[in-house]
Amino acid sequence: MNAPADTTRLGYFLGPHGVQGGVKVYVLGDPQQLLALPRVWVEGQGWLRVRRTEALAPGAVLHLAGITSREAAEALRGLNVYAADADLPPLEEGSYYYHELRGLPVRDANGQPLGEVRDVWDSGHQDLLVVSHAGGEAFLPLQAPYVLVQTGESGRPQAIALTADAPAGLLGEGAEEA
């Protein structure tokens, strides 16, 4: 069962917390984004109502409708958890959800198109953009000062730009870089 469109992966379940069905979540990003969610989509389970959320460094604990025992929580271990994009809280300026970057054009320093962001991966120490281009796909580190997120008047992302001093070959073979 694939996650529905217009959802963002928040992280994955680490295992039970306590004996009443709490589930620890490894959170991609800020755990505060989970605190006010009314529901989450769980791999293999579908939409579940969030009864209560607790902050627990470095992630959170979710108490979900229908998950009332340690055994039920254990069954969720390793499953991905998603939120509806519309349910996510607004972020501070300069921060973006992954779903806001998907589909953005990738341009060189002169504004010429190079490809499009297909996905975003959290590799731990930095985010990687999966960019589709004429030569296939490439991983592009979302790393200043060479790769910048360009924003519009709304402050939301509009494009990804490689700077003039970006190392050659960032997008691999087949991409026409400046």
UniProtKB/Swiss-Prot annotation:
- Domain of life assignment: Bacteria
- Which Pfam families does UniProt cross-reference here? PRC (PF05239), RimM (PF01782)
Question: What are the disulphide bonds in this sequence?
Answer: none
Q: Name one GO molecular function term.
A: ribosome binding
A GO cellular-component term linked to this record: cytoplasm
Compartments reported by the entry? Cytoplasm
The chain positions of domain PRC barrel read: 93-170
Major localization listed first in the record, in broad terms: cytoplasm
Q: Which GO terms describe its biological process?
A: ribosomal small subunit biogenesis; rRNA processing
Record bears the keyword Chaperone: yes
Q: Which UniProt keywords apply?
A: Chaperone, Cytoplasm, Ribosome biogenesis, rRNA processing
| Coiled-coil portions | none
HAMAP family in the cross-refs: Ribosome_mat_RimM
The domain section of the record reads:
The PRC barrel domain binds ribosomal protein uS19.
Q: Which family does it belong to?
A: Belongs to the RimM family.
Subunit composition and interactions: Binds ribosomal protein uS19.
Function text: An accessory protein needed during the final step in the assembly of 30S ribosomal subunit, possibly for assembly of the head region. Essential for efficient processing of 16S rRNA. May be needed both before and after RbfA during the maturation of 16S rRNA. It has affinity for free ribosomal 30S subunits but not for 70S ribosomes.
Enumerate the PANTHER family for this protein.
RIBOSOME MATURATION FACTOR RIMM (PTHR33692:SF1)
The name on file for this protein is: Ribosome maturation factor RimM
